Amino acid sequence: MTNKEILSVKDISLSYQQRKIIKQLDVSFIEGNISVIIGPNGCGKSTLLKGISRLLKKESGQIVLDDLNMDDLSTKEIAKKLAFLPQSATAPEDATVRDVVELGRYPYQSMLKKKAADEKIIVDEVLSQVNLLELAEQPVKNLSGGQKQRVWVAMALAQKTAVVLLDEPTTYLDLGHQIDVLNLLKELNKTNQMTIIMVLHDLNLASRFADYMIGMKDGKILYQGSPKEIMTPPILQDLFAINAIIGEDPIDQKPICLRFD
């Protein structure tokens, strides 16, 4: 793992439905890290991810991705470097697992003269990596919640990007599937050297899976640091207005919230 900044957000301002959400925000993300953004509802977490991915047009500021100003890049050029999975991704009614994962190859279709067989090999490799190859021809609508989320992760993986943004990837999943998806992301982070930036609501899961945590409130970044630096009673009181009791996970020594009032 390096200390190189792969993504830098400088002086960015964002609005949603004519309401200023983020004003002159600065934040950087280190290559190869799993960075988790936490904060109360409505604080701007999802808005920030949408602004970085250009789904939401910024009003001012600069975003630098892999030393390149994103304003100078086309949508397809960005899609080769950065993937974004929204909170509630949906597939066409009759789309199969393979159909959805193949969408991740879209940025390469017009310029690469690859045979269909070559593209199938790439998609099959991705499906195998996320343990979905046997379900490749199944309709996505027939899958469990955890399997569906693996499909979306596979689509992002097929993009062959260095950075993946995920907005609450564990939403609507039961606890077992939450752990399954986060373990998959951790594995991809290690094996593919993938930089992962995600929003999570569960503080203990955020602490467990993050290398770096970012605390947001009222459209501002108030705290940044390791889980041990962020998961403290004063910081959680400031962010969430809770009185938290913090302990230590005996397995990985990460901080955990034992109770809060």
What are these regions (language model features)?
Residues 102, 117-135, 160:
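Conserved ABC ATPase "signature" region
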Residues 29, 61-69, 78:
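Conserved ABC transporter NBD signature motif
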Residues 7-9, 22-24:
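Conserved structural motif at the start of ABC-family nucleotide-binding domains
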Residues 38-40:
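The feature captures the beta-strand-to-loop junction immediately N-terminal to the Walker
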Residues 164-168:
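Catalytic Walker B motif of ABC-type/P-loop ATPase nucleotide-binding domains
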Residues 114, 139-143:
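Conserved ABC ATPase signature
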Residues 53:
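Helix-to-loop junction immediately C-terminal to a conserved catalytic motif
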